[in-house]
Amino acid sequence: MALTPAVNDINAWINFFCTAEIPVLKNTTLEIEQLKQDEDRLCARALTATIINDPMMVFRVLCYSQKNKSSHQLQDLVQVEQAVMMMGTTSFFKNIPTNFLVEEILENNPIALKHLLKLIHRAHRAAHFAADWATHLADLRAEEIHTAALLHDLAEMLMWCFSPEKMNIIHKMQEADKTIRSVTAQQNVLGFKLQDLQKALVEAFQLPPLLSKLMQDDASTEQRVRNVALAVNLARHSANGWSDAALPDDFHDISELLRIEINRVKRIVGAPELE
């Protein structure tokens, strides 16, 4: 494995990620290997069902698809199943190896692994919220919204993999002082904000422009972008329960997005009824 950057330089990290192999979850590798051995079950849909459980694997598939798209391909592929179908299962197994595991990288740092797995769980909740709301809004391409929400915090996931010590410091700072904003802690420890790393990462890997736009919180006046941003916020603020002070504002914003009552928003997202 290439040496991680010793300096707090966002460009150095982008250069590192561009040459580093992106790890995947152990369970992803096991399930894909099982499919590889089972010709009766092996198909693009079965592979997709496994891939979408792992944000880093989703990222790898979309990056490969974008980098190797045919000259006859008229549009970028944002949906994983479409990307797998276009490359075919033979090309998938040949060009996207899954033997570099998150659990091996963080074998000696179980605390970082715990935080990473929690972050991945949060990403899945955000993706579920976003896709559910997209359906409510009659968005015919809800899968694109799902993918954008799932990958919204990819940079943070990768930093937990490759810079767990610094990420642990950030976490401890925020645990010790709840008033410290995450971007402040990140700037102090890493020398940059993770949202800036995310933007640079998406640009460097040339992900589809649509996906990039859907993950841009600063463009959240547009309905689809706002959907993703609000889903990510809700998943973050409710990660440790439903008592976070930011949740009332989240519920209000979601009610405006969906054009429904706040009490109905709470029922839809599974928030408990408080006396």
Question: How does the language model describe each region?
Answer:
Residues 1-165, 186-248, 252:
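Conserved alpha-helical "signature site"
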Residues 177-186:
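Substrate-binding clefts and substrate-entry loops adjacent to catalytic sites
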Residues 237-243, 263-270:
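Terminal end segments
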Residues 258-261:
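RNase H-like, two-metal
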Residues 271-275:
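Extended, compositionally biased alpha-helical segments that mediate assembly or anchoring
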Residues 164-176:
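Post-HEXXH active-site segment of zinc metalloproteases
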